[in-house]
Amino acid sequence: MTVLANLQKLYGGTYTEQNLLLSGTHTHSAPGGFMMDLLYDISTLGFLQETFDAYVDGITMSVRRAHENTRRGRIFINMGEVEGANINRSPTAYENNPETERRKYASNVDKTLVQLRFDSTEGQPLGALHWFAVHPTSMNNTNVFISSDNVGLASLLFEQRVDPGSLPGKVTHVASCHFAEERGCGSFVAGFASSNLGDVSPNTRGPRCEKSGLECDVSSSTCSRDERCFSSGPGEDMVSSTRIIAEKLLDKALELFNDRESSHEIKGPVRVIHQYVDMPQAVASVYDPQTRTFKKVSGCLPAMGYSFAAGTTDGPGAFTFKQATKTTNPFWNVVRNFLAAPKLEDEECQGSKPILLETGRLKFPYSWQPSIVSTQLAVLGDVAIACVPGEFTTMAGRRLRDAVSGAFAQKGRGKVHHVVVAGLCNTYSSYITTKEEYDVQRYEGASTIFGPHTLQIYLQQYERLAEAIAIGSPVDPGPDPPIFTKRLLSFITPVIFDSPKFRYGYGDVLLQPPREVTPGDKVMARFVSGHPRNNPRHGDTFLSVEKWTSNGTWAVVATDANWETRFEWIRTHKTLGTSEAVITWQIPPDVVPGDYRIGHFGDYKYIFGGVYPYSGFTRTFKASRGPAGASSRGSTPSGGYRGKREEGEVVEPASGYRSNTSKS
């Protein structure tokens, strides 16, 4: 809603709830505290306004850039199969679906990558948007760095292939588009968005016991008492696994992108429809095979099952919870009832789910999970995009595609040949499984918050939206979702002040990089730093890797958005407010020989008020493609660190390359 309000301030009624579709590309390695529903913010100690504002401002900026660079163009759709990039992490739940239904599909996950290619009318590629069913959990829950994971890396790699001179994002203070001769401006945009990934994992080696390496119990995903069960990816560690999955997506995406013959041009009008739904009040009809009649079913108040606390094989949970749990525990029931005891009608509504958290009755200090969700359907020519408010499992997504396609076919007004499930749209309401998967009560079923008939309600809701679009009939907007921004709580302390290390200034280098490096080396530098929460640096960067050019200037070759760089912030003293930034650059195999330096940019909070920028740079170091010590052409920049310290030695105060700070 805040993004929409921002856009309406800029463009009036151009953007509305009807036509603005926000679907998370999704990652499990990003700052939390922005969801507003309490359950989703508990792990981050509540709502964090700085994180919320950073996301809102970033999304608004992206839409604004797109709006102000609108061009006439053409859209093409193509699709292909990606092998070895995903597995089903709840196969026992999937197997509970009807055998006749499962026989229709070759796999228990969707392997199809769908691509929309955007070209200008002159044939210039403008962008490519993809949907593929895989969780962005290659970076596991031991990771402490912000990462866009496998789908984010695939996006970056795609952009670099199409526009090899570009930098991800924009570095306004050192490398704006006037450096286009050296580095491109990055006008091409690639994205890999979420689809029906609810039960889909990128950790293709499958679940194993942590110590013994034995297979986990297939039903409960457990091992012996002293072992955890988790899945791992195809690489030697989570970083290499992320890259392997990303490159699999990239390879197929590039193949589709360059295959003009099998691409189909999308022609026709753009139509969108949107409606809010109060899920606990929603009803649907289901067929009862015993009575051979249809009966009415309804949604439930939100609730989480016991298996929710067990986590998944991508990220195991806490305590002794197990997946596929269908009974309650007296101890945890006491804890549950202290918060909010479920009523008999709640337990009956949730069916086979033993309730661990009756979130629908938890209203203090505000809502724990949403009851009113956004549903939206967009149609581009003969392509329909079902924007769903959660994570649909493989079979749930397949049923949704069939339902939407069937609704358009029944009305017979403009055929829809392709239906895409766009996950995590507008509202997040956890998972959506089939009724059969729900009854198994794996993690996904326990997290299907509106009960066993959630999917059936959504199927009939999206059928109604499809029928309304097909005949050109409007729908009522539905109930307004609650707004409780004034009641949000946060237990995260704000940044009180920063102070530099004694006898140093902000941006001063504490650890210099080695003098000479070669491909594969990891170059590390450490700086005196302020708190990164002082400024999210939208369109900017916390670090730069710069190369000395033949025309006597520094050109940025990498920022904090590049995969080969890493920015680590460390609070060295909580009371004094001192901190350091550790910047790492892994030298790529295609590095251009020459002289380089690493820069750090940030802002510090002055103890008597105000936030002020600073910057600092390392000494110059030489990169070569051969053994260390190989020479490279070009003049040597002046002003760099030229002391006699050994490589990697800590820099003493008032030595080396000094920082630039600003305070007025």
Please annotate each region the language model reported.
Residues M1-G634, G639, G643, K663:
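Non-catalytic substrate/cofactor recognition surfaces at enzyme active-site rims
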